């Protein structure tokens, strides 16, 4: 599962049974469009964990309309499919950042550490939502 942001990509993977999402890492980049190393790291993760498809969060507005970030995410999806040869499934990610903040607050994580973890937690939530409802994609 991926949470594609302006300068980061949060990454989550599933457990061996494919039922539980686990946060993995955050891929950082210096500039928004500097994606070469991001694609390379995703390729490494695909090989390391034998990933067969990718779930990518789609940041729609609350009313369901497409945001500027969603347009950039859709372009990222196309390029990711081209580079990896894998299907990239788009998953609605509305309110995942709010949910991630709630989880960090409940876990007692200091606010100063939130920025370092929010994208990875959001990726985990995106992937878990897909896993919980994957029958609607088949």
Describe every region a protein language model picked out.
Residues 7-138:
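Phosphate- and other anionic-substrate recognition elements at nucleic-acid/protein interfaces
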